[in-house]
Amino acid sequence: MKILFVHPNMPGQYKHLARIMGADPKNQVVFITLPKPKVQIPGVHKVEYTASREPDPGSHRYLIPTERAIYRGQEAWRVCKKLKDAGFVPDVIVGHFGWGEGLYLKDVYPHSPMLGFMEFFYSAYNSDATFYEKRDPTPDECARIRTKNMFHLMNLTYCDWGITPTFFQLEQHPKEFYPKISVLHDGVDTEMVTPKADAAVTLPNGSVLTAKDEVVTYVSRNFEPYRGFLTFMRAAEIILKERPNCHIVIVGGDGVSYGRKHPSGRPYFDVMMDEVKLDKRRFHRFGLLPYDKMLDVMRISRAH
């Protein structure tokens, strides 16, 4: 079977699937992505691309995401055209097209079915736009968000089928597309993600926690409102007051992956540390951890 994976941040959601497909010598697996020199998957041929340019600074700001998606889509088209000229025609195209890479693949491979990862469809109402600010969106925000969906609608139209991890994510999409989207969770590698009775975590202060301790954990790539960090920190204050033996361990970075930076420019972690009153002897923070270390944090956790 010939399989084409598409994701700008290889392997994205396809870490396990690409590995399994690549391990079968009967398969020919290609993965197109932005330059990722350190990422290699045995049996998978990685093909890198770079966007030819950035959006024009003079473009209407509503159109910036769409313009950027078009440039990425053009480069993905060029890469796939070279693959096709070399004889590679996939039996299936599997990708997360939320950045534009899938926009023109049907023009290269009109007969190859496309399976798209439908992560999110934006809405100004009852969704993510202002949920933690407790206010109505402005008319400008409504227009910007509606326009941002332009190329996502193209993806929904051109994909033969879509998958999304949760019913919440499905319900963000227009109802007319529900029949072509399956709710399918990313899954868990149950051979790797397992309990470990002797798991232990050495904290930044040098002390050690194990599964015998009362531990609550929070793990996120970045500490930000979109990932529930503000809510968690306010809950942490209550937990530490009501559970005198409890330790809280958090893992994550200070960047912003979704939404906006704090108006002050400070990391949300610093802002929340000023707001809440925590027993710092029982509140422990790690930055980003290697995967095996992060698993040990989860293994000692009573509640996450």
For the regions a protein language model found, what residue spans apply to each?
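Acidic donor-binding loop of glycosyltransferase active sites
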Residues: 160, 299-304
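Carbohydrate-associated surface elements
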Residues: 168, 187
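Conserved donor-binding/catalytic core segment of Leloir-type glycosyltransferases
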Residues: 202-227, 233-238, 248-249
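Short N-terminal targeting/anchoring amphipathic segment
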Residues: 81-99, 105, 113-115
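Acceptor-binding helix/loop patch of EC 2.4 sugar-transfer enzymes
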Residues: 53-63, 111-150, 191-196, 200-202, ...
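Nucleotide-activated donor-binding/catalytic signature segment of Leloir-type glycosyltransferases, i.e.
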Residues: 252, 256, 261-296
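Conserved nucleotide-sugar phosphate-binding/catalytic loop shared by glycosyltransferases and other
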Residues: 38-64
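N-terminal subdomain of nucleotide-sugar transferases
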Residues: 1-45, 163
